């Protein structure tokens, strides 16, 4: 499980609910760097103290995208629902902007993560740091050279920049750049067990799912989430059996087009 900085429940409460379960999976904290480094460091310290096992640093979303569906639907968070882990964070004081300046380019982007920020984060925590939002092989190579514990190929489900490359397109390029030096996970568009198998065939070490779990939660609470995960697992097992894979290690690129490796220029 990966808990977001923006979660509406405290990171400590989630850890207390998850960690005692003997059948649980990993518990990671998805971190958004805040303009106030002291506040960011306090978040990291809270995650460590609560028992989180890794930090997932989002590197590609210094601002929210243009979410037309939400606007058309008139979506608003219900009263009382908000990012409780950011309570007490003071917003940066806006400075006066000239006619040729932008609140985005002369404000928010000054706080976007840099390679130096990643090195700083690694220096203040004992937890492994994974980078989420990597789509370009050059960035993947740089991240590994800086000691990233893993990469997550992600385009935020197309909600941040709707014309960003699909994760299925970016994944094999990133895997090639990493050359096995770190695990490469992927999210975005995982809806069926067959999608999981395709991701593994493209080189993913694991997949992450977001919206399907939320759909299950909205329909049937915790039982709905468990049902969604069970469906994905059952579909994956059937897909593996029908493609002759007895283990996930046997899911290679050959499953997708009959060749062991992508053709030159295919990715």
In which residue ranges do the predicted regions lie?
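Alpha/beta enzyme core
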Residues: 12-17, 21-24, 34-186, 194-215
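Alpha/beta catalytic cores of nucleotide-metabolism and tRNA/nucleoside-modifying enzymes
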Residues: 166-267
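Short amphipathic alpha-helical segments at helix-loop
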Residues: 28, 155, 217-221
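N-terminal capping/small domains of soluble enzymes
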Residues: 1-37, 41-48, 232, 251-267
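Contiguous N-terminal and early-domain "leader" segments and peripheral loops that mark the onset or edge
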Residues: 1-3, 129, 142, 227
């Amino acid at each position: 499980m990966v808990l977001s900085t923006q979660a509406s429940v405290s990171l400590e409460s989630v850890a207390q609910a998850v960690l005692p379960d003997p059948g649980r999976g990993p518990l990671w904290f998805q971190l958004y760097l805040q303009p106030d480094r002291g506040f960011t460091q306090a978040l990291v310290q809270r995650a460590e103290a609560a028992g989180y096992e890794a930090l997932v640093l989002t590197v590609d979303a210094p601002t929210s995208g243009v979410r037309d569906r939400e606007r058309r639907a008139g979506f608003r968070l219900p009263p009382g629902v908000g990012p409780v882990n950011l309570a007490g964070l003071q917003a940066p004081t806006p400075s006066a902007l000239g006619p040729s300046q932008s609140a985005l380019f002369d404000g928010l982007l000054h706080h976007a993560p840099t390679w130096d920020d990643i090195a700083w984060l690694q220096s203040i925590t004992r937890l492994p740091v994974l980078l989420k939002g990597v789509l370009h092989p050059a960035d993947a190579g740089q991240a590994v050279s800086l000691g990233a514990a893993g990469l997550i190929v992600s385009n935020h489900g197309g909600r941040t920049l709707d014309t960003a490359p699909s994760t299925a397109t970016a994944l094999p390029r990133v895997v090639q750049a990493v050359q096995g030096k770190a695990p490469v996970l992927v999210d975005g568009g995982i809806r069926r067990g067959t999608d999981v198998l395709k991701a593994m065939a493209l080189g993913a070490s694991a997949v992450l799912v977001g919206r399907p779990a939320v759909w299950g939660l909205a329909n049937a609470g915790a039982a709905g989430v468990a049902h969604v995960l069970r469906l994905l697992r059952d579909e994956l097992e059937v897909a593996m059996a029908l493609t002759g894979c007895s283990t996930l290690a046997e899911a290679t690129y050959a499953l997708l087009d009959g060749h062991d490796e992508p053709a030159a220029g295919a990715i």
